[in-house]
From Swiss-Prot:
Origin species: Streptococcus pneumoniae serotype 19F (strain G54)
PANTHER family: PHOSPHOPENTOMUTASE
Cellular component aspect of the GO annotation: cytosol
Co-factor note (free text): Binds 2 manganese ions.
Gene3D superfamilies linked: Alkaline Phosphatase, subunit A, Phosphopentomutase
Any single GO BP term: metabolic compound salvage
Protein family: Belongs to the phosphopentomutase family.
The protein's name in its UniProt record: Phosphopentomutase
Enzyme Commission numbers on file: 5.4.2.7
Length: 403
C-alpha cells in the first residue's frame, strides 16, 4: 500500500538556491556561474516575502549565507533540503529528465549566437523561403514577431529563433505561411537536428495572426520533441497503470512519454495553478502523480534579468500556495522544487548552474525538519518508492524521512 495516495510535484522553473559545486564549469557571457544564487540574490537585492513557502521550511535550507529576508522556522510544517544536479547541462529538458531519474552525459546543444549558416541554408533549400538572419538568436517569442512580423507579411521569409533552451522555433503568420506548410518545414528541421553539432530538444512551430502592432500567437503551436533516451519514472508509473497528469510544458518536455493525462499548456503561472487545482479536484484522480511546470519565473524575468519582476512572481505563487494546500487530500504529498537556476542579477541572460530547493508538505505529516542534501533524481526515486515501481537510472529515495 502506498504511503501517499497522490503526489503532486510542482517545478518553479529556474528558482535556484545557490551555486552548485561545479558551477564554475558553466558560464554566462564569459562569467563562470560560481557566484550565482537566484533566491539569495533576489532576497538580498529587492527583498523576498514568501511566508507560505517559509512556513514549510524554505528559510531552513542549509546555505553558507541564510536568505536575507526569509527566516528559518522554529517549527516548520514540512521538510526541506536542496538538491544537486549531476547531468552535464543546465537547460530545462536536462533538469526535468534528471528529476525523473536520468543522467544526461551528453548535453543538448544551445545556440547563444544563433544557428549555424549550414542549418539555415538547408531549411531555405527545403522550404523555398528565405530566413530572416537578424532574428536568428535567442529572442522573446512575442518580441520576435513584433520586430519581424511586418517584414514576414511583406516578404514571406521565415522567422527562425532560439532561446536559452535547446530549441529551434519557427514563427509564421497563418495568412502568409499556411499551417500545413509551417508544420512540414518544422518536421524537416526536426530531421536535421537529431545529432551534433545541432542536437536539439525541440522544434517548435509558433503560428500567429493579426496586424503589425497587434500580433497574437495562436493555439496552433506544435512541438516536435525527442523522447527521453531511457525510461523515466513516468514510464514506470504508466506501466504499473498508475495515472500521471502533466500540467504546463511537462508533456512537451517528455514528448508524452509516460504521461497519460495531458492537462494542456499554461497561459501563465496563475493559469497553471488553476489547472493544477482542477486536476487535484478530479474525482477520478484517486491515486497517482501530477507533474506541473510554472515557467514565468524563467521566461519572463530570469532571462530578462528582471529581479523585481522575478520577486513579484514568487510572491504571486506564494500567495496561491494555500489554495494548493487546501486542495490536498489527507494522504497527498506536495513537492515544490525547480529545474535549474536563472539568477536575474547575474551576468548574461542564460540559466545558472545551481542547487534547487525542495519543499515537502502533507496534511498527514506528524514530523518536520531537514532532509539530507541529495540530487535531482532523488525526487523520482521517492515517487517510485511510494508507488512500488522501479527507479530509473539514478536517485535515492527519501520517502522514509517523511513522517
Amino acid at each position: 500500500m502506498s504511503k501517499f495516495n497522490r503526489i503532486h510535484l510542482v517545478v518553479l522553473d529556474s528558482v535556484g538556491i545557490g551555486a552548485a559545486p561545479d558551477a564554475n564549469n558553466f558560464v554566462n557571457a564569459g562569467v563562470p556561474d560560481g557566484a550565482s544564487d537566484t533566491l539569495g540574490h533576489i532576497s538580498k537585492t529587492v527583498g523576498l516575502n514568501v511566508p507560505n513557502m517559509a512556513k514549510i521550511g524554505l528559510g531552513n535550507i542549509p546555505r553558507e549565507t541564510p536568505l536575507k529576508t526569509v527566516a528559518a522556522e522554529i517549527n516548520p510544517t514540512g521538510y526541506a533540503t536542496k538538491l544537486e544536479e549531476v547531468s552535464l547541462g543546465k537547460d530545462t529538458m536536462t533538469g526535468h529528465w534528471e528529476i525523473m531519474g536520468l543522467n544526461i552525459t551528453e548535453p543538448f546543444d544551445t545556440f547563444w549566437n544563433g544557428f549555424p549558416e549550414e542549418i539555415l541554408t538547408k531549411i531555405e533549400e527545403f522550404s523555398g523561403r528565405k530566413v530572416i538572419r537578424e532574428a536568428n538568436k535567442p529572442y522573446s517569442g512575442t518580441a520576435v514577431i513584433d520586430d519581424f512580423g511586418p517584414r514576414q507579411m511583406e516578404t514571406g521569409e521565415l522567422i527562425i529563433y532560439t532561446s536559452a533552451d535547446p530549441v529551434l522555433q519557427i514563427a509564421a503568420h497563418e495568412d502568409i505561411i499556411p499551417l500545413d506548410e509551417l508544420y512540414r518545414i518544422c518536421e524537416y528541421a526536426r530531421s536535421i537536428t537529431l545529432e551534433r553539432p545541432a542536437l536539439l530538444g525541440r522544434i517548435i512551430a509558433r503560428p500567429y495572426v493579426g496586424e503589425p502592432g497587434n500580433f497574437t500567437r495562436t493555439a496552433n503551436r506544435r512541438d516536435l520533441a525527442v523522447s527521453p533516451f531511457s525510461p523515466t519514472v513516468l514510464d514506470k508509473l504508466n506501466e504499473a497503470d498508475i495515472d500521471t497528469y502533466a500540467v504546463g510544458k511537462i508533456n512537451d518536455i517528455f514528448n508524452g512519454a509516460g504521461i497519460n493525462h495531458d492537462m494542456g499548456h499554461n497561459k501563465s503561472n496563475s493559469h497553471g495553478i488553476d489547472t493544477l487545482l482542477k486536476t487535484m479536484g478530479l474525482a477520478e484522480f484517486e491515486k497517482g502523480f501530477s507533474f506541473t511546470n510554472l515557467v514565468d519565473f524563467d521566461a519572463l524575468y530570469g532571462h530578462r534579468r528582471n529581479a523585481h519582476g522575478y520577486r513579484d512572481c514568487l510572491h504571486e505563487f506564494d500567495e496561491r500556495l494555500p489554495e494548493i494546500i487546501a486542495a490536498m487530500r489527507e494522504n497527498d504529498l506536495l513537492l515544490i522544487t525547480a529545474d535549474h537556476g536563472n539568477d536575474p542579477t547575474y551576468a548574461g541572460t542564460d540559466h545558472t548552474r545551481e542547487y534547487i530547493p525542495l519543499l515537502a508538505y502533507s496534511p498527514a505529516f506528524k514530523g518536520n525538519g531537514l532532509i539530507p542534501v541529495g540530487h535531482f533524481a532523488d525526487i523520482s526515486a521517492t515517487v517510485a518508492d511510494n508507488f512500488g515501481v522501479e527507479t530509473a537510472m539514478i536517485g535515492e529515495s527519501f520517502l522514509d524521512k517523511l513522517v
